[in-house]
Every structure is written in structure tokens, then in C-alpha cells.
Amino acid sequence: MEIFSLTHANDIDGLGSAALLKVAYGMGSENIFFTDYSAEGLSYSIKKLSERIGKKSITLFMTDLGMNDYLIDTYKKIIMKVKKQGGKVVWFDHHVWSLSQIKKIASLCDVAIIGENSRYCATEITYRNLISGKMLSKNNKFLRKFVWIVHKSDFNKKPEKRKDYELIGTYAMSIMSYITLGPSEIRDKKLRDIIDVIAAGRFSSPRIVSDGRKFSDRNERLTKIMLKNLYKIGDIAFVGFSPNLQSTLGCGAIMDKTKCDIAIYINTENHTGHLRSRISDTTLLSRRMGGGGHPHASGFPIDRKRFSGFGSDASRKEFVEFLAGEIEKTYRG
């Protein structure tokens, strides 16, 4: 039965879990599809994936795809298509979901290892269930190290060795440079290239490093601009606005400058909000906003009809005022 993958486009955990599927099953790169957590991004990916599957009976692995409640019907469409055609669906994830959605999705899948997991990311779950203890690859030592790197990256833990830390940065910056292209064949090809490099037993390539370095320079420049005009929400949060920053670094820069508990970076290009916290559970706020993630790192979509843009100080203040109200209800209500 042919293997397909639908995974998270925006970080190395999504790409890493797909790379392990390629190692385990020899899955063709053309069978790997990517999505973010937006309705538009998911609809694009489901359409492309469905066209590729056609009427075949296949096994679909869905990895690192946190379930935002409002997207469940879209996910169900592809799951039901695969099942109707005699295929199987396996879902590996580690994000915070509502219990009701966990039960709904688990009942539809053949295998579902889902819900909050503070120990293992999606790449680790994939490795532990499909590769660990099996001589599937001559690169087992490499795979163990790669999975460790992904764990450090996804749980925001800094490795001791500088080269490992730099590799995490290379992944983050190169992936971000590709996803700024938006859902497209060009984006997907570049992300598949990263997966091919990893599946072949290499951590990176000259092109990945070069693309990451270019985006890093841009990211640093835009971050400096963002930090000149931050918005404070009580004694708990600061908000910054900028197009297409790497979210962890954007929030980290806000935290470093303000020493706040919750840093909120608003991607003005994608209309998404990104949260990082030292203390508070950010999923309480992100889920209220229609998003999700991890306790100390999460995100949410922004309604384009209600907030059409953030080009002016007035439009940003309007959104910050809205956020302040949601924070009040979430943490002090």
C-alpha cells in the first residue's frame, strides 16, 4: 500500500517526522504534503493531496498537526476519503487538543497517538514507533542524533554544542524562508528538498545553509525595527508587529528586551499571532483565539475580516486593546 504524508510545514518537527517516514517506507517525496494551521493553508494542502491520491487505496500518515477545533471538518474530509477507498490513517502528534476532539479524531484513525505530550515531539513519536530497534537504515546513528536535535528544537532547549545550536537555527531560518512563499508548489519543493537531505543521512546542505543565512540577516533587520515600537498589556505581556519573522526568535527578542511573562509576535503578512511564555500556559489564550500549540509556545489565526491590516498605529492599538480584553478574561477572569 502506497505511503503518503501530510505534515506541518513550519518547523523541523513536521519535516523531520516526514523524513523518518521516507526512511522507514521509502516513501516518494512527491507523496509528502505540507500545511500550516490556517484554514486557507489546510484547504490548499488537502486539495493537492486528494488529487495526488486519486482513487488509490493508500496509508496516510498525519504528523505534527495540532488540532484547532475549527479545522476538524476539513481534516475529516481527507480522512474519510482515505478510509472510503480502503486505506488507513495514522496520526502522530503531541500538541494540546481538547478532549472532545481527541476522541473524535481517534475514532476515525486506524492509529492515533495524539494529545499533549511533554516528553516527545512528533519526530520522536514517529521514530519510537516505526524505526527504533529496527535495522531499517545504515544511518541509525545519524537518525538518533537527528531526532535528538529535533527534540531540542521543538521544546526550545538549547544544546550545549555550538554546532548543534547553529544547526537548529539553520533549520528554523531556511524553513521560514520557504514558508514565506505561501502555500505553493515552489514552497513544497523546497521543503521536500530538506526532507530528502535528511532521509539521505545528512543534517544539511550548502543550499539549506545559504538560504537560512540569507533569511537570518533579514530576520535580524526586521526584529530591530519591531523592537522600536512594542505595545504593553498590563504587567503580563508585550506585543510586537512585523512581517514574516521566525516566531520563536521574534518572541524571544521581545522577552529579552522587556523581561515580560508573555511575548506576542503578530505576523502582519500571514495574519497570525505567536505566543511564548516563561511562566503562563499560552494555550489558554491561543485556544480562546482559535489556535493551539504547547503550554509555553503556541499560536492563533487572526480574523482578516475583523482586523484587515496593521499598517497604522491606530490599527495596531485596536488589536492590542482586543488582545488585552482576551488576556484579562483568560488569566484574570
Model regions and ranges:
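Short acidic, S/G/P-rich loop/turn micro-motifs used as interaction or catalytic elements
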Residues: Y37-A39, G66-Y70, Q246
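Gly/His-enriched, cation/cofactor- and phosphate-binding structural elements
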Residues: E2, K55-S57, K84, P206-G333
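Divalent metal-coordination and catalytic microenvironments
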Residues: D11, L21, D64, D93, ...
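Short alpha-helices
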Residues: Q101-P183, R187
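Anionic-ligand anchoring segments at beta-strand to alpha-helix junctions in alpha/beta enzyme folds, i.e.
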Residues: E2-S50
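Long, charge-rich alpha-helical interaction segments
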Residues: S177-K214
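A short helix->loop->beta-strand "cap" motif at the edges of active sites that frequently abuts
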Residues: K83-V89
